[in-house]
């Protein structure tokens, strides 16, 4: 039995560690664990949290910026549509006003021509016996030329007025398009 106890003791003698070595190993493990925890794990955990918060803030800001950009784009599209409608309406009104002005000018020219013709006829009636054959055609020709010149002048003035109105309208459209483009570029 002593042999058996001794052989078992020899067997377990190599398996059971030395208490001092085991204590030193546990203490060194605890020191290493505390060192890694305080000097590596916690700073690394704080850095990862800061980095995660930083990225999340940027993601949130990007989403918010995209939403605001979409809102601004919708507003600018709405304003562009309103501007186009306004320009179409303004163009139609200017064309109507120009046509009315042209008609009024024609009526005035015709009235003036009629008045000139009537005056010419009165003069012709007074001097009918003396200059009937000689000046009858001259008075009518003068009246027609005056009417033509007056109509040409009125037509030219109307064209100039219409061109200036259209040019002003185009400038206004370009200004509004440029301002909307600038807003679009700024929003992007």
UniProtKB/Swiss-Prot annotation:
One of its GO terms (molecular function) is proton-transporting ATPase activity, rotational mechanism. It comes from the Bacteria. It is found in: Cell membrane. GO terms for cellular component: plasma membrane; proton-transporting ATP synthase complex. Belongs to the ATPase B chain family. F-type ATPases have 2 components, F(1) - the catalytic core - and F(0) - the membrane proton channel. F(1) has five subunits: alpha(3), beta(3), gamma(1), delta(1), epsilon(1). F(0) has three main subunits: a(1), b(2) and c(10-14). The alpha and beta chains form an alternating ring which encloses part of the gamma chain. F(1) is attached to F(0) by a central stalk formed by the gamma and epsilon chains, while a peripheral stalk is formed by the delta and b chains. F(1)F(0) ATP synthase produces ATP from ADP in the presence of a proton or sodium gradient. F-type ATPases consist of two structural domains, F(1) containing the extramembraneous catalytic core and F(0) containing the membrane proton channel, linked together by a central stalk and a peripheral stalk. During catalysis, ATP synthesis in the catalytic domain of F(1) is coupled via a rotary mechanism of the central stalk subunits to proton translocation. Component of the F(0) channel, it forms part of the peripheral stalk, linking F(1) to F(0). This is ATP synthase subunit b. It comes from Mesomycoplasma hyopneumoniae (strain J / ATCC 25934 / NCTC 10110) (Mycoplasma hyopneumoniae). The lineage of its organism: Bacteria, Bacillati, Mycoplasmatota, Mycoplasmoidales, Metamycoplasmataceae. The gene is atpF.
């Amino acid at each position: 039995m002593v042999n058996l106890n001794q052989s078992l003791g020899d067997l377990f003698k190599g398996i059971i560690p030395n208490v001092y070595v085991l204590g030193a190993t546990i203490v060194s493990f605890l020191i290493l664990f505390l060192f890694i925890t305080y000097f590596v794990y916690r700073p690394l955990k704080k850095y990862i949290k800061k980095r995660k918060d930083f990225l999340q803030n940027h993601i949130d800001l990007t989403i918010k910026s995209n939403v605001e950009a979409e809102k601004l784009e919708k507003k600018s599209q709405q304003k562009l549509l309103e501007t186009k409608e306004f320009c179409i309406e303004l163009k139609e009104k200017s064309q109507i006003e120009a046509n009315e002005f042209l008609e009024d000018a024609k009526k005035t020219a015709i009235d003036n021509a009629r008045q000139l013709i009537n005056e010419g006829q009165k003069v012709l009636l007074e001097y009918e016996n003396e200059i009937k054959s000689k000046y009858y055609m001259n008075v009518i020709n003068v009246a027609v030329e005056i009417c033509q010149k007056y109509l040409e002048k009125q037509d030219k003035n109307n064209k100039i007025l219409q061109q200036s109105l259209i040019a002003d309208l185009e400038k206004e459209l370009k200004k509004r398009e440029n301002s909307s483009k600038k807003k679009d570029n700024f929003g992007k």
